[in-house]
Amino acid sequence: MHPRERLDYSPIDRRPPLRFPEGIRLVLWPLLALEEWDLSRPMARMVISPPQGQPQLPDLPNWSWHEYGMRVGFWRLKKMLERLRISPTVTLNAKVCETYPQVIEACIDNGWELNAHSYDQVPMHKLDDQRATINKSMDIIERFSGRRPRGWFGPGLTQTFDTLDYLAEAGIEYIGDWVLDDEPVTLKTAHRPVVALPYNFEIHDIVMMALQQHPSDVMYSRALDQFRCLYDEASERAKIMAIACHPYLSGVPHRIAHVQRAFEEILGHPGVVAWDGAKILDWYLAQSERR
């Protein structure tokens, strides 16, 4: 199904405003992405290119870059999130449960939401059987945590025209792949509606640090610039601001202080709270029922 068939165009200033409960002006949506990079394939991303520029397998340097995030960066971010009393949405490749069980146990012990991010970091277009991979991913996370994921992020936010129907069939209630609005939107599928929550590419460590290659302090300055605009607009309608972190990027020593300062300053404003994706979804569904 083409995206135009799944939702109608809706200018934001012509919709009835969404409202948060009394006392809440803006919701911060913190996300922590945990991935598995298979050394037998090209890496999902590169921090360093090989001599002569031709990628080789196995790509040990770039695999090690990501592996540092799981061995060190995650634990640094975990301490920061605990210190700030933030419960993020953890979007994870299901294979992380098998390869890094201590990481997922730490997330479960903190009560953090686990959201499915496929089995490992392979674009949905490359899968032989999307339906099987989606169900396998959800089954592993449910078996490991005791809870079936309600949300989904595709690897690299990838989808085919059929992916959303497979996700709805598997019981997924919300996605973060459709980065097209400041508010949640309801998408049609062949089975049941799925809600696209307002994710973004702008306050995202891969975009800022790995692709645009900004200095480390841009993690702070851009987040605050984004926040100031949304906080001002939130006087008229509910606003949600996502911040996406990956351990191999946000969890390194020269960035962690800037990430922490952004969270501290944003959450220090009156009426700002941090919610995970499931809580945002429940709020939105309740709003929709009242309309």
Which role fits each region the language model picked out?
Residues 2-195, 220-243, 249-291:
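Catalytic alpha-helical scaffold of carbohydrate-active enzymes acting on polysaccharides/glycoconjugates
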